[in-house]
């Protein structure tokens, strides 16, 4: 048995996971692609040292920012964390905002081959001179099945599909259709997607961004920028990072950077709702206030 807590950013997932871990002798397992990176503690709202002392937390801040981490790498680490928790007689509690990680955990993972760096670099240079609709038309000419699955403005996924096709000569769809066995089936978990009121969530997002700035997010981003990492790396594209780097370079004001960071985060939260609705159909939607009662009542009946 394991507990799964998904949900949009700033919805109270981490606090709920900590309360459940204290109640159920649990281990909190990070299921958020940005909280993996040790470079961004404040800006990703990772658990504090005090919170980590209250209950075991694993896979938080465990990856260097220069690593282009993948869902496959996370799944390997999640398997180890799950085995260790169960071996210790503890309740595994997976918590985070990365829907793709939860999908891989409960539905299996497509075995997509890695793309050589040379091909990735060539295609990214090519993409710089093209609009996203043009890239989508190019994908449609090469891989019509995958192009039909993607929106014409989804630049990141279009480029990924092109990379796989150029590297393998096969459609990304073919790899996606062949999935490995899931690490946990839905019959082995209690899974919730936290669904707070949207207006309240937006206010929480804005307040939290201001709080993170007060707690040193700008200085954290300055240290990250000083590393000279490739701007295409995931850690360099975390919400708020590009705008705060521009503020540090004097290109925009800090106030404008904060406003843009908040807007990006609100848009991301909207996408998290959409992903869960379509890709995590078996997760129970509950408000943050309802979720703890849901878990505890279910556990008491088992």
UniProtKB/Swiss-Prot annotation:
The protein's Enzyme Commission number: 2.5.1.75
Protein keywords: ATP-binding, Magnesium, Nucleotide-binding, Transferase, tRNA processing
Binding site for substrate: 9-14
Enzyme kind, highest EC tier: transferase
Stored SUPFAM superfamilies: P-loop containing nucleoside triphosphate hydrolases (SSF52540)
Cofactor(s) of this protein: Mg(2+)
Residue positions binding ATP: 7-14
Lineage: superkingdom: Bacteria
GO biological process, one term: tRNA modification
Assembly description: Monomer.
NCBIfam families from the UniProt entry: miaA
PANTHER family: TRNA DIMETHYLALLYLTRANSFERASE (PTHR11088:SF60)
This protein's name: tRNA dimethylallyltransferase
């Amino acid at each position: 048995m394991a507990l799964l807590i998904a949900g949009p950013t700033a919805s109270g997932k981490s606090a709920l996971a900590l309360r459940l871990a204290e109640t159920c002798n649990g281990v909190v397992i990070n299921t958020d692609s940005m909280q993996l990176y040790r470079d961004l503690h404040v800006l990703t709202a990772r658990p504090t040292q005090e919170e980590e002392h209250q209950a075991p937390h694993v896979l938080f801040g465990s990856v260097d920012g220069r690593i282009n981490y993948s869902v496959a790498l996370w799944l390997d680490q999640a398997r180890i964390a799950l085995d260790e928790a169960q071996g210790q007689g503890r309740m595994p509690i997976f918590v985070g905002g990365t829907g793709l990680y939860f999908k891989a955990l409960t539905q299996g993972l497509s075995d997509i081959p890695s793309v050589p760096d040379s091909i990735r670099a060539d295609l990214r240079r090519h993409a710089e001179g093209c609009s996203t609709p043009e890239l989508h038309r190019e994908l449609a000419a090469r891989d019509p099945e995958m192009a039909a699955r993607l929106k014409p403005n989804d630049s990141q996924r279009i480029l990924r599909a092109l990379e796989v096709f150029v590297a393998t000569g096969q459609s990304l769809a073919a790899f996606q259709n062949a999935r490995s066995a899931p690490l946990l089936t839905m019959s082995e978990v209690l899974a919730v997607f936290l669904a707070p009121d949207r207006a309240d969530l937006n206010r929480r997002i804005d307040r939290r961004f201001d709080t993170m700035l007060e707690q040193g997010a700008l200085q954290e981003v300055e240290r990250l920028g000083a590393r000279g990492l490739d701007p295409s790396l995931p850690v360099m594209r975390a919400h708020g990072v590009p705008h705060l780097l521009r503020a540090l370079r004097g290109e925009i004001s800090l106030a404008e950077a904060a406003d843009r960071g908040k807007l990006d985060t609100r848009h991301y939260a909207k996408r998290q709702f959409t992903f869960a609705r379509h890709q995590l159909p078996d997760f129970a939607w509950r408000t943050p206030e309802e979720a703890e009662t849901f878990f505890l009542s279910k556990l008491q009946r088992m």
